[in-house]
C-alpha cells in the first residue's frame, strides 16, 4: 500500500512486544528529519521510517473478536437512455434486500449482505457497506473497500461520485474527520497516498515524477517504494489532493463511456492516534490503514477494440482474473498456494486479502439483458468472495517511532527550548545607593551591557519567533476535537446517524457530474468512429484539467505548479495554513493550536495586549471560513506579526518598568530618563504598528466577504464560459464526426449497390444451376432405374432356368443311383453262385479223372469261361450305359455349377453398380445441401424471394420423388 502493511503473517504466539508492525511511511528505511527553517515539510513525507513494533490489541476475554466474513453488497444501476432506446430488457433484478434473481430463470439466485436497487443513493450504500470499515479504521483496525464490476456499471460513480451525490471516498474522508471531532480524548494524525496501476505499472498520482514504482516486501509485508504521503488537515485539504491525483489518472473513451477508467486506483488513508495530553506518555499508538480501491472495469471479448485500448483491456482483464483466482484460492481450504505475485494489484493488496483486515466488496452491476453474462460473472465473483473468513485485529505501535510520537516529542523539545530562552534573560540588578565616583563606571558598563542586551534580545526574539512558528506548524498537523475531553464518546453510538454535510469548498473538488452515465448524443457521438479515440482522449483530458467548479478553482493551477515542482516548501506553506473546514452541519473539525494552553510567554503580556486579543477574537468570530490557502497564509502572517510585536512590546514594558524603578531611585540620572523616553517611543511605535495590523486584519476580513461575492459572480461566469466552450467543442466534434459518418454512409451505399448486383447475379446463377442439376440428376436416376430393372428381369429368368435344370439333374441322378444299386446286387449274386459251382465241380472229380481228362477239362473250362464272359458281357452292357449316364449327369452338374458361379459374379457386379449409384446419389444430395446453404444466406441478406421459394418447393418435390424410387 502507500505505506507498509502490517505484519499479517505473524504467528499467533508472537502477539507481544516482539511482533513487527507496519511503519508509518514508505520510500526508504530512514525517516527524513524536518529542519526548523522549513526546507522539509512535516506535512509531506515520502520517506520510510525504521522498523517498528506493534501488536494486536489485547482485548478482554469477554470481548474477543470472532471470525467474520467479507461484507459483500451489490448495487444495480438504472438502464441508460441508450439501453432503453435500443429496447434492452431487465435480465437481473433485486428480489428484496438480500437476493439477486434472474428474470428469465428465477431458479438462479444469489444471496448477499445487502442488495441496492437503482434508486438507492450512494449515502445509503456508504452507511451499509463502508461505515463500519471506516469506523474500525479509526479504532486501529485495517480496512479495505473494493468497487468491482464491468465497464460502465457505475464503479467510479460509487467511489468518487459528483457534487450532487458524493461517493464512498469523499464520504469516508468526511466521516473520518467527524469521528475525530467526536473523540475528544484522543489526538490523530492523518496522511494519505494515492496511486494507480496502469498496464501493470505503479504510478504515484500525488507526485507526477513518481512513475514505475517498485513493490518491496519484508517481514512486515508489502509496500510501494517511493510513494508520496501527504499529511491532511481537513476534508477540503484531502479532497483537493484527490482531485489533483484524478487529473493524473489514465482515462479514455470506449464504446460504453466517454471517460472510462483505464487503471486501478488505490487511495490509502493512514491513521495514527494516541491518548490526548499527558496520557500519551508510555501509551501505545493505534496505527491503521483504510484502502479505498476503484478497480477498472473488465471488458468483454465482444467489444471491438484496437491499439492502446486493446492493450489496456488485456492488462485490466489479466489483473482482474488474477484477483478472481486469489479469491477462489482463499475460499478453498485445500489450496496450498495463493498466486498473489501474478499481478501488481493482488501483490499490493496481499495484506488486505490475507484475513486480518476488515474488507467490504461493493459489486456494481447493470440489469440490461445485453450484459447478462458479464453481470452473472460479477455475481459469481461476489458469491465466492462472501465465503472468505477474516479476523480483524487492532494494531498498536508500542515503540516511539510513530510519526505522531515524533511530532509530540519535537513539540515538547521546542517548548523546553523556548522556556530556556525566557529564563536566560538576566534581569538588571536593582541599583543601590552608590557614590559619585562609581557613576561614570556604572554608566560605561550600562552602555556596554545595553548594547549586548539589545543584540541578545534581538537574537532571542528571532529564535523565539522561529520556535513559535515551528511549534504552531507541528501542532496544526495533529488533529484534536473541540469537544470537552471529559465527555465520553460512547453515547454517540446510540444517537441517530450523523449526516455528511459537504461545504462549497469541499464540493469544489468533486466532479461536476458523473462521467459513467453520459448523454445519448455524446455517447453516440464519441463511439461512432474507432479511429478518433486517441484524439478525443487527449482533448477531453485537457478539458478535464481546465474545467474546475467551485470557489477555489483559481487556486488549483497554482497548487498544481507547486506540486509539480516537487518543492517541500509548498507543503510547509500548506501546513502553516489554518485548516479550511466548511461550517456546515455542526460536524466540521476545528484544528486548534495548543500553544496558548499553559504557555508562560502568554502570561507575561500586559492588559493592553489582552484587550487587543479580545478585539482579535471578535474579528475571528466575524471571519468566515477561508476560501483559499493564499488568504489563510496572509491572515496567519498578519497574526504572527502582531504576536511578535506584542511580545516585543511586553519585553519593552518589563524593561520600562525596571528602568522606571531605577529612575525613581536615582532621579538625577538623565541617561536612564533618555532610555525610558526611547522605550516609550518604541512602545508607542509598536502599539501603532499593532493597531495598523489589527486594522489590516479587519480590512482583510471585510475584503474576504466581498471576495466571496465577487467569486460567486466569477464562478457563474466561469461556469457559463466553460459550458460555452464545452458546447462549442462538442459541436465541432459532432460536425467532424458527422462528416466522417456521411463519408462512411456513402461508402456503405456504394458497397450495398455492388452487393445487390452480385446478389442478383448469384440468384440467376443459382436458379440455372438448380435447373441444370435437377434435370441431369433426374435423367441419370431414370437411366439407372431402367438398367437396374432390366438386369433384375434377366437375373430372375436365368434363375428360373437354372432351377429347372437343377431339378431335372437331381431326378436323373436319383434314378441312376437306384439302377446301379440293383446291378451291384445281381453281380454279387452271380459271383457267389459261380464260386459255389466251382467248388462242387472240384469235389466231384477225382484226381485221376482230372489227369485224364485234362484236355477235356481245359476245353470245358475254356468254354465255361467263354460262356461266363458272354453272360458277363450281357450283364455288363446295362452298367456301362448307367456309367455313361452318370458321367453325363456329372458333366451337366458341373455346367450347372459354372452357370451358378457366373450368376453369383453377375449379382456381385450388379450389387457393386448399385452401391456406386447410391454413393453418387449421396454426393448429389451433399451438393444440393450446399446449394441450400447458399440460398439461405442470400435469403437472410435480401429477404424472402418468391422465385427462390418456388425453386425450393420444386426441389423438395424432386427429392420426394427420388425417395420413392
Swiss-Prot record:
SMART domains xref list: KISc (SM00129)
Low complexity biased stretches: 19-28, 40-56, 564-577, 851-862
PROSITE patterns: KINESIN_MOTOR_1 (PS00411), KINESIN_MOTOR_2 (PS50067)
GO biological process terms on file: microtubule-based movement
Primary localization class, coarse: plastid
Statement: the UniProt record of this protein carries the keyword RNA-binding: no
Localisation: Plastid, Chloroplast
KW Nucleus (keyword) present: no
Compositional bias of kind Basic residues: 551-561
CDD domains according to UniProt: KISc_CENP_E
Coiled coil, from the record: 389-483, 628-703, 738-846, 896-931
Keyword terms, alphabetized: ATP-binding, Chloroplast, Coiled coil, Microtubule, Motor protein, Nucleotide-binding, Plastid, Transit peptide
Polar residues composition-biased segments: 29-38, 949-965
Chain spans, region Disordered: 1-69, 551-633, 842-888, 942-965
Residue ranges with Basic and acidic residues bias: 606-623, 864-888
PANTHER family recorded: CENTROMERE PROTEIN E, KINESIN-LIKE PROTEIN KIN-7K, CHLOROPLASTIC ISOFORM X1
Family: Belongs to the TRAFAC class myosin-kinesin ATPase superfamily. Kinesin family. KIN-7 subfamily.
Official protein name in the record: Kinesin-like protein KIN-7K, chloroplastic
Native organism: Arabidopsis thaliana (Mouse-ear cress)
Gene that specifies this protein: KIN7K
Amino acid at each position: 500500500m502507500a505505506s507498509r502493511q502490517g505484519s499479517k503473517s505473524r504467528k499467533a504466539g508472537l502477539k507481544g512486544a516482539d511482533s513487527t508492525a507496519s511503519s508509518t511511511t514508505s520510500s526508504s528505511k530512514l525517516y527524513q528529519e524536518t529542519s526548523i527553517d522549513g526546507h522539509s515539510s512535516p506535512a509531506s513525507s515520502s520517506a520510510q521510517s525504521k522498523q517498528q513494533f506493534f501488536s494486536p490489541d489485547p482485548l478482554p476475554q469477554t470481548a474477543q473478536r470472532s471470525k467474520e466474513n467479507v461484507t459483500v453488497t451489490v448495487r444495480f444501476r438504472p438502464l441508460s437512455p441508450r439501453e432503453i432506446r435500443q429496447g434492452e430488457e431487465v435480465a437481473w433484478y433485486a428480489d428484496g434486500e438480500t437476493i439477486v434473481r434472474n428474470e428469465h430463470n428465477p431458479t438462479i439466485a444469489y444471496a448477499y449482505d445487502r442488495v441496492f436497487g437503482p434508486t438507492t443513493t450512494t449515502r445509503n450504500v456508504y452507511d451499509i457497506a463502508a461505515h463500519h470499515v471506516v469506523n474500525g479504521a479509526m479504532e486501529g483496525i485495517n480496512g479495505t473497500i473494493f468497487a468491482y464490476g464491468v465497464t460502465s456499471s457505475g464503479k467510479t460513480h460509487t467511489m468518487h461520485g459528483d457534487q450532487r451525490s458524493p461517493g464512498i471516498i469523499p464520504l469516508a474522508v468526511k466521516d473520518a474527520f467527524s469521528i475525530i471531532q467526536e473523540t475528544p480524548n484522543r489526538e490523530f494524525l492523518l496522511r494519505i497516498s494515492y496511486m494507480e496501476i496502469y498496464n501493470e505499472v505503479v504510478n504515484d498520482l500525488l507526485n507526477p515524477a513518481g512513475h514505475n514504482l517498485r513493490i518491496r516486501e519484508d517481514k512486515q509485508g508489502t509496500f510501494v517504494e517511493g510513494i508520496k504521503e501527504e499529511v491532511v488537515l481537513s476534508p477540503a485539504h484531502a479532497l483537493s489532493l484527490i482531485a489533483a491525483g484524478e487529473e493524473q489518472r489514465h482515462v479514455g473513451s470506449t464504446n460504453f463511456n466517454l471517460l472510462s477508467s483505464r487503471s486501478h486506483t488505490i487511495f490509502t488513508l493512514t491513521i495514527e492516534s494516541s491518548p490526548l495530553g499527558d496520557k500519551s506518555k508510555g501509551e501505545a499508538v493505534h496505527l491503521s490503514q483504510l484502502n479505498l480501491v476503484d478497480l477498472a472495469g473488465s471488458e468483454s471479448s465482444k467489444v471491438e477494440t484496437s491499439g492502446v485500448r486493446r492493450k489496456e483491456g488485456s492488462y485490466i482483464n489479466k489483473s482482474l482474473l488474477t484477483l478472481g483466482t486469489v479469491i477462489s484460492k482463499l475460499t478453498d481450504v485445500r489450496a496450498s498456494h495463493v498466486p498473489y505475485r501474478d499481478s501488481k494489484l493482488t501483490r499490493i493488496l496481499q495484506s488486505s486479502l490475507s484475513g486480518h483486515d476488515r474488507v467490504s466488496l461493493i459489486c456494481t452491476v447493470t440489469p440490461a439483458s445485453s450484459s447478462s453474462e458479464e453481470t452473472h460473472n460479477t455475481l459469481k465473483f461476489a458469491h465466492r468472495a462472501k465465503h472468505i473468513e477474516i479476523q480483524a485485529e487492532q494494531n498498536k505501535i508500542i515503540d516511539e517511532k510513530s510519526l505522531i510520537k515524533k511530532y509530540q516529542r519535537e513539540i515538547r523539545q521546542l517548548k523546553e527550548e523556548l522556556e530556556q530562552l525566557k529564563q536566560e534573560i538576566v534581569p538588571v540588578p536593582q541599583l543601590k545607593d552608590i557614590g559619585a565616583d562609581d557613576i561614570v563606571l556604572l554608566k560605561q558598563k550600562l552602555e556596554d551591557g545595553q548594547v549586548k542586551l539589545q543584540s541578545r534580545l534581538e537574537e532571542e526574539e528571532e529564535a523565539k519567533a522561529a520556535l513559535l512558528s515551528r511549534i504552531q506548524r507541528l501542532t496544526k498537523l495533529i488533529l484534536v476535537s473541540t469537544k470537552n475531553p471529559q465527555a465520553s464518546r460512547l453515547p454517540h453510538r446510540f444517537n441517530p446517524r450523523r449526516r455528511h454535510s459537504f461545504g462549497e469548498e469541499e464540493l469544489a473538488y468533486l466532479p461536476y457530474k458523473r462521467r459513467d452515465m453520459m448523454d445519448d448524443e455524446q455517447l453516440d457521438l464519441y463511439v461512432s468512429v474507432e479511429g478518433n479515440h486517441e484524439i478525443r482522449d487527449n482533448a477531453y483530458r485537457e478539458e478535464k484539467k481546465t474545467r474546475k467548479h467551485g470557489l477555489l478553482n483559481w487556486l488549483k493551477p497554482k497548487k498544481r505548479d507547486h506540486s509539480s515542482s516537487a518543492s517541500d516548501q509548498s507543503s510547509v506553506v500548506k501546513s502553516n495554513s489554518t485548516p479550511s473546514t466548511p461550517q456546515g452541519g455542526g460536524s466540521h473539525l476545528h484544528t486548534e493550536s495548543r500553544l496558548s494552553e499553559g504557555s508562560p510567554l502568554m502570561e507575561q503580556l500586559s492588559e493592553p495586549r489582552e484587550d487587543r486579543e479580545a478585539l482579535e477574537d471578535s474579528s475571528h468570530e466575524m471571519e468566515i471560513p477561508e476560501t483559499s490557502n493564499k488568504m489563510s497564509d496572509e491572515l496567519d502572517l498578519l497574526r504572527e506579526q502582531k504576536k511578535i510585536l506584542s511580545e516585543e512590546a511586553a519585553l519593552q514594558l518589563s524593561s520600562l518598568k525596571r528602568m522606571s524603578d531605577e529612575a525613581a531611585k536615582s532621579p538625577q540620572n538623565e541617561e536612564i530618563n533618555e532610555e525610558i523616553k526611547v522605550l516609550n517611543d518604541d512602545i508607542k511605535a509598536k502599539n501603532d504598528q499593532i493597531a495598523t495590523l489589527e486594522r489590516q486584519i479587519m480590512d482583510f476580513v471585510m475584503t474576504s466577504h466581498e471576495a466571496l461575492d465577487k467569486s460567486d459572480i466569477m464562478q457563474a461566469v466561469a461556469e457559463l464560459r466553460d459550458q460555452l466552450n464545452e458546447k462549442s467543442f462538442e459541436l465541432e466534434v459532432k460536425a467532424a464526426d458527422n462528416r466522417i459518418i456521411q463519408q462512411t454512409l456513402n461508402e456503405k451505399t456504394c458497397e450495398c449497390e455492388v452487393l445487390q448486383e452480385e446478389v442478383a447475379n448469384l440468384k440467376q446463377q443459382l436458379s440455372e444451376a438448380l435447373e441444370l442439376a435437377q434435370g441431369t440428376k433426374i435423367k441419370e436416376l431414370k437411366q439407372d432405374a431402367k438398367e437396374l430393372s432390366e438386369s433384375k428381369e434377366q437375373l430372375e429368368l436365368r434363375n428360373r432356368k437354372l432351377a429347372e435344370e437343377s431339378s431335372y439333374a437331381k431326378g436323373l441322378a436319383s434314378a441312376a443311383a437306384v439302377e446301379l444299386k440293383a446291378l451291384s446286387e445281381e453281380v454279387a449274386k452271380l459271383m457267389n453262385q459261380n464260386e459255389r459251382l466251382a467248388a462242387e465241380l472240384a469235389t466231384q472229380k477225382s484226381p485221376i479223372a482230372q489227369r485224364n481228362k485234362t484236355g477235356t477239362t481245359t476245353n470245358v473250362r475254356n468254354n465255361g469261361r467263354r460262356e461266363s464272359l458272354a453272360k458277363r458281357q450281357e450283364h455288363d452292357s446295362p452298367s456301362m450305359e448307367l456309367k455313361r449316364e452318370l458321367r453325363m449327369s456329372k458333366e451337366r452338374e458341373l455346367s450347372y455349377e459354372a452357370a451358378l458361379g457366373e450368376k453369383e459374379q453377375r449379382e456381385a457386379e450388379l450389387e457393386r453398380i448399385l452401391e456406386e449409384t447410391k454413393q453418387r446419389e449421396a454426393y448429389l444430395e451433399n451438393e444440393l445441401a450446399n446449394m441450400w446453404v447458399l440460398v439461405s444466406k442470400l435469403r437472410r441478406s435480401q429477404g424472402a424471394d418468391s422465385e427462390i421459394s418456388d425453386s425450393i418447393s420444386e426441389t423438395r418435390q424432386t427429392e420426394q420423388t427420388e425417395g420413392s424410387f
